[in-house]
Amino acid sequence: MDYEILFSDETMNYADAGTYCQSRGMALVSSAMRDSTMVKAILAFTEVKGHDYWVGADNLQDGAYNFLWNDGVSLPTDSDLWSPNEPSNPQSWQLCVQIWSKYNLLDDVGCGGARRVICEKELDD
């Protein structure tokens, strides 16, 4: 699968990030994060930029340890994509997922903070 990826320079909360991507005919990045080639490219870019970025995964459905990518696929808590000791508080208020600049891996955080955004669009072959 090929993807078009958009990295925003604007910061916004998680809900606004989803709207931002949708207004461009895209979605918060999710399926590209499960593609080994794409995830390497995305993480290489975010590492150079040194900012936190929203991705399309959250725990808003039930507040348990059940993170899902926005396309409905499970994001296991033992995934290699998580930063060390993360997710750390998904049963409380840390229900959304970012790429955390400290480790350049995923981190569960509150949904109201301002972060940059990564959008994706799957391209037809």
Swiss-Prot record:
One matching Pfam family, short form? Answer: Lectin_C
Please report any disulfide bonds recorded for this protein chain, giving both cysteine positions. Answer: C21-C119, C96-C111
Q: From the record, what ranges are coiled-coil?
A: none
Q: Does the keyword Calcium apply?
A: yes
Tell me the ranges covered by the C-type lectin domain, including all copies.
Answer: 1-120
Q: Molecular function (GO) terms listed?
A: carbohydrate binding
Q: Which key words are in the record? A: Calcium, Disulfide bond, Lectin
**Its biological purpose:** Role in the defense system of the organism against microorganisms. This calcium-binding lectin binds galactose.
Q: Self-association or partners: how does it assemble?
A: Homodimer.
Kindly provide the name given to this protein in its UniProt entry. Lectin
Species name:
Polyandrocarpa misakiensis
